[in-house]
Amino acid sequence: MTATYWISCDGIPPELVLLKHEDAKTLSIKRYGPDKNLFVGSIGIQIFENLDAISEDLVNIATYVYAADRLITRGTEKNIGPGWKRDLNFIIPVLEPRVWDNKKVNTLLKDTLSFLSDDFYNFHFIKREREEGESQVFAFGEEVFKHPDSVNLFSGGIDSLTGAINDIAISNKNPLLISHWPMPYTKTRQQRLIKSIRQKLPDYKTPHVQARIHLKNPPERQEYTQRSRSFLYLSLASAVARQLGINRVHVYENGVIALNLPIWKQSVGGMDTRTVHPKYIKLFESFYNEAFNADLKILNPFFLKTRAEVLEILKSAGYAELIEESHSCSRTRVSSKFAQHCGVCSQCIDRRVAVEAANLQRYEPKGTYENDVFIESLSGIESKKTWRKTKARAMAVGYVKSAVEIAKLSPEEFLSSYPEIYDATPYLGIPEEEAFSRIYDLQIRQSETVLKVFDSLVKKNVKKITRGAIPKDSLLGIVAAQGHLTEDIPLYVENIIRILTNSLPTIFQKEPPKNESVVQAAAEGLFKTTRVDLDREFPQLAFATRGFKADFTNKAHTVFIEFKYPHPPNRKVAQIIKEMNEKILLYTDNEAYALFVVYDHYKMISDRKTFCEDFEKYDRVFVRIIV
């Protein structure tokens, strides 16, 4: 079920929330006082006068949303769907409540954030007065510099680096680069890269703006997805642009990452990042222009390019060596001080493929990646404590498998397989039919690049592979043995669970199912809708001397799925456990995989973790509880 939170921001007593919502989960976010839990520092280069009131409100709203996003976790990745979403209700003091209470502005704000993070949002604004000497996000100063043409988001990754070079060196423009640094080493990396750019381009003197916004004394467990960081980032950039009288913000991101089609098709909601998705960019633009009565344009000039094509721009311009200082990892918090990149996340894998395709490996010295999924054992990586939950195998194999599948698709098949395209085509500023054609061409080029890179890597390392010097469960070992073309059972199981967890609780929200047959029928409908090809109660399966029918089985008859539904008065948990124990050995002794899906509508299982672990100690057995 979706968890509801009320977030009281500076000066709003949480008790006011509890008076109306006795069962509410509350969170207090404070920027001031001895118990503050959010730090907002001044921007590193002092170039701004006071922000206008509406801009200050926007930056504060974005800051509170970002802090709440970090502090309120979604739960584990086994809880995808309604349980993955959060119902976030903010009470925020603002200088200009008339602007934020405007129905259209408020609706656009909620729509923008809801699409970005796949959560529910509500905002309640209270009038506040600006206090004398109050700390501002933007510091004051009178530094003189050549007036910028645009404000560019600058994360320090390959795309934003190339965007900066594209504007400064190729187009002879003068962008102001703005960054957000939540951690000291992020600041250091960005500054190091800026220093390298200035050494190559000494005439570029426009200040680099760094905003420091982060949690103070954060809890050990934080929400890692950080979808709302993009809203904070764009809010900062828009406020800077407004102060300087600029109406253009550049967001340089290659189209493959911006669109971010799911590596596995059943990924849902907040599991797929939308931080620079065309629809999100247009939603933010519409929201901002309505609130400020402005004409801001947010542009992504790299949307129709792959990352390898972006690197070719940098290479052709003569600045390829700068990639050594760039940083692309999406798991910065868990990479070590010895390596800039984790090597496991999709961003790291895509970066490596692009660098290989552009033949720029010499600018990535040994140690750039903490884990080398290409030649290291993927199970070995997953066994390390820090990387245990990264799904290294699923991510790496899924990346290559997705390229194989997309490369074979006709335009019609591509659209059918990835209906997410419909979210992007209306927002590219060109006719939708042309937009689809260009996105299809982009994805085909990306797939062909990935496959060419792995063709080359396997050929280059064939001796090491055949002699066992490269583990068979490394990505190269798996690709060489065509393992990426076969069904990855753990990934297959998680896909099924995502589908069920996303929808079963919603189906039975008003009226619980009467029996297991009703649950099975609902599941069958979901499988058909999401194109999961399963057989329902396949005719009697013979194992040894016994025969029985599973609820569902895959076409290869290697995965058997059974639904269990404990419910009062007679279908008790003990009976469910007995039935599962009777089936487990029958499956495992015959080298089959078993997935038991327990729909616990009445929450009769008190210790879900132990319940699952008691069965999953057997090989090839998966147990998932959906509530």
Give the role of each language-model region.
Residues H180-E321:
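ATP-dependent adenylate-handling ligase core
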Residues D533-A556:
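Active-site metal-binding core of divalent-cation-utilizing nuclease and nuclease-like domains
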